[in-house]
């Protein structure tokens, strides 16, 4: 199968979904932490003939299940009519696929009318994954996210209204060493205002060539320590409060030092115990290193 992207980026909950790349890059491409921020990968579609060849290849395989995740940057940025055409094109090869999921930005939702979203849902749009990154307005501004917490919440309420499911993600350490507490509390507050199917957290990584890497190198951004990252994750998890709405919390990204996941209704305390043990272990290790230096 031919792809433009050599690595597969998909949410954990899509592990059993069929995968089809339809685009590469991001329509926004300005977030300081993002690999697309260098402007070298503009949003582009996979050529139609390649899409058809890949689908024909998939049709010859034993594709089970009814879900497909459309690989690419913010796929939801494309016009509703184009996305519906893609859904129908997929189903002409794989009629068993009835649910589609993809990544999108909050402003991709806001730029579509209720009628367009309803048409997408009826055509098979089931799940949209959105990176909220932080619930703190200042942190989002510093990261050049191009969206505010209120705009993100408005977009998610719009998806609720249209009965389209969504999964969210945020970045541990995005507030740096100085704003970790505010970052955790405000992000938890944002999560408490909406009803996601899943929440995924990953740890900030200053990837080569990004504005974030330059900010770290010139001292404008002080990364949070591993100990602080664990404290931040625990504070975030502690303050996400869903009384009846179940949500899957996934902290299994390769960037995280402590992998954990579970239901926020039934497994939250277990996950907090794991984090608190890790925080204590990190503190003990720091103390030992300090003692060695003094000795």
Feature roles, as predicted:
Residues 2-14, 192-295:
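Auxiliary Fe-S-binding modules of radical SAM enzymes
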Residues 34, 107, 131, 135-139, ...:
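Conserved strand-turn element in the central/C-terminal portion of the radical SAM core barrel
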Residues 4-53:
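Canonical Radical SAM [4Fe-4S] cluster-binding loop centered on the CxxxCxxC motif
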């Amino acid at each position: 199968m031919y792809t433009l992207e050599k690595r597969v980026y998909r949410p954990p909950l899509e592990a059993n979904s069929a995968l089809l790349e339809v685009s590469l890059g991001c329509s926004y491409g300005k977030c300081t932490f993002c690999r697309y921020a260098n402007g070298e990968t503009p949003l582009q579609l996979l050529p139609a003939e390649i899409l058809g060849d890949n689908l024909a290849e998939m049709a010859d395989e034993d594709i089970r299940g009814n879900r497909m995740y459309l690989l690419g940057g913010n796929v939801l940025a494309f016009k509703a009519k184009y996305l519906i055409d893609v859904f129908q094109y997929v189903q002409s090869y794989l009629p068993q696929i009835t649910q589609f999921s993809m990544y999108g930005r909050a402003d991709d939702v806001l730029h579509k009318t209720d009628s367009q979203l309803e048409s997408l849902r009826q055509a098979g749009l089931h799940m949209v994954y959105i990176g909220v990154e932080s619930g703190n307005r200042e942190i989002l501004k510093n990261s050049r996210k191009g969206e505010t917490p209120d705009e993100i919440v408005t977009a998610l309420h719009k998806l609720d209204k249209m009965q389209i499911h969504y999964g969210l993600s945020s970045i541990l350490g995005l507030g740096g060493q100085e704003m970790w507490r505010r970052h955790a509390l405000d992000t938890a507050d944002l999560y408490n205002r909406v009803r996601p199917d899943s929440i995924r957290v990953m740890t900030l990584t200053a990837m080569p060539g990004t504005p974030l890497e330059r900010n770290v190198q010139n001292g404008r951004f002080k990364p949070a320590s591993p100990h602080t990252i664990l404290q931040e994750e625990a504070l975030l998890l502690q303050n996400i409060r869903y009384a009846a709405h179940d949500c899957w919390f996934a902290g299994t990204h390769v960037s995280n030092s402590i992998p954990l996941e579970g239901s926020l209704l039934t497994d939250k305390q277990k996950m907090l115990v794991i984090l608190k043990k890790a925080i204590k272990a990190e503190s003990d290790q720091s103390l030992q290193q300090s003692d060695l230096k003094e000795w």
